[in-house]
C-alpha cells in the first residue's frame, strides 16, 4: 500500500526551530506526503521561512491568530485530506529521511493506527536517548487505550492514527493530547507497532512550562476515562513510580 501521510506542523514565533522541522519532512524519500503548516500569526521570521519552502515544495499553510495550541491543531485536522495524520510541531523532527518509507511498509488495508518510539533531543539536537530508556513511560509492545491509565505512554510525535478516527481536541486543557490519543485508540481495531524510532522530540513545550496545571488536567482526563477510584489508585502508582525513578538518579522528563 502507498498511504498518504498528512504531516501537520503547528508553530508560533518558531523561527529558531521551524526550518529543521520543515527539512525533516520535505526531505523524506517517501513521496506520498501532504504537509500542512499552521502558524498562529507569528511576529518573527517564521512566516518568511515557511514561504521560502512553500515556493519549492507542495506545502499548504495558513497564518492567522488562534486560541492556542489545540485550536491550531484542530485547524490542521480540518485541512488534512490524507490517510494517516501525524503532528510534528515546530522543533520536532522526523528522525531520518526514510522514516515515512519504513512506516508505510507497515500499513495494511486494515491498519487503524501506527506508532513507534521517540528520541529525546536537547536544544542543540544532541540525541539524549529514547523516551523508553530515559523516562518512566515505556512504549508498550502492544498499545491499547487501557495502556494510558498511568499517563502518556506513547509520544504524540510518533503516533499516526487514520484520519477517519481523529476527533477534535479539547480546548483549555493542557492534557488534551492524552484525551485525543485515548479516543483514537478506543475507536481503533488494528493498531500496529512499527518497531522503529519515528521522531525526535525537542525537550520543553507548553505542558513542561506549566507543569502543575498539566498534572491537574491529566488527572481530570484520566478520571473521565478510567473512573474515580481506579484513577486514584493509578495516580498513587504514578507518584510511587516517579519517586523510585528519581531515587535511582534518573531525570524524569
Predicted ranges, named:
Residues 31, 39-48, 89:
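A conserved acidic beta->alpha catalytic loop
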Residues 85:
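Short aromatic/hydrophobic "clamp" motif used to bind/position activated sugar donors
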Residues 63-80:
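Glycine-rich, basic loop-to-helix element that forms the pyrophosphate-binding segment
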Residues 97-130:
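Conserved donor NDP-sugar-binding/catalytic core segment of glycosyltransferases
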Residues 130, 135-214:
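Conserved nucleotide-sugar donor-binding catalytic segment
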Residues 1-27:
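N-proximal low-complexity "stem/linker" segments adjacent to membrane-targeting elements
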Residues 189, 208-232:
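Catalytic core of nucleotide-sugar-dependent glycosyltransferases
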Residues 3-6, 34, 179:
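Cell-envelope/extracellular polymer assembly enzymes that use nucleotide-activated donors
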Amino acid at each position: 500500500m502507498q498511504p498518504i501521510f498528512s504531516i501537520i506542523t503547528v508553530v508560533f514565533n518558531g523561527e529558531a526551530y521551524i526550518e529543521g522541522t520543515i527539512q525533516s519532512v520535505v526531505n523524506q524519500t517517501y513521496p506520498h506526503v501532504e504537509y500542512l503548516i499552521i502558524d498562529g500569526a507569528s511576529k518573527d521570521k517564521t512566516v518568511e521561512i515557511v514561504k521560502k519552502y512553500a515556493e519549492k515544495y507542495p506545502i499548504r499553510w495558513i497564518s492567522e491568530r488562534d486560541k492556542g495550541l489545540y485550536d491550531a491543531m484542530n485547524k490542521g485536522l480540518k485541512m488534512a485530506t490524507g490517510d494517516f495524520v501525524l503532528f510534528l510541531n515546530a522543533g520536532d523532527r522526523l528522525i531520518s529521511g526514510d522514516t515515512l518509507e519504513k512506516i508505510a511498509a507497515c500499513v495494511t488495508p486494515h491498519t487503524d493506527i501506527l506508532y513507534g518510539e521517540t528520541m529525546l533531543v536537547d536544544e542543540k539536537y544532541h540525541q539524549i536517548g529514547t523516551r523508553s530508556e530515559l523516562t518512566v513511560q515505556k512504549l508498550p509492545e502492544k498499545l491499547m487505550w487501557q495502556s494510558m491509565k498511568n499517563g502518556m505512554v506513547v509520544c504524540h510525535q510518533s503516533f499516526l492514527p487514520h484520519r477517519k478516527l481523529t476527533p477534535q481536541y479539547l480546548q483549555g486543557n493542557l492534557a488534551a493530547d492524552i484525551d485525543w490519543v485515548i479516543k483514537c485508540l478506543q475507536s481503533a481495531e488494528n493498531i500496529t507497532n512499527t518497531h522503529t524510532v519515528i521522531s525526535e522530540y525537542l525537550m520543553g513545550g507548553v505542558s513542561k512550562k506549566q507543569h502543575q496545571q498539566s498534572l491537574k488536567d491529566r488527572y481530570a482526563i484520566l478520571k473521565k476515562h478510567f473512573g474515580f477510584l481506579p484513577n486514584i489508585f493509578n495516580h498513587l502508582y504514578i507518584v510511587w513510580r516517579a519517586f523510585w525513578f528519581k531515587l535511582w538518579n534518573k531525570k524524569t522528563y
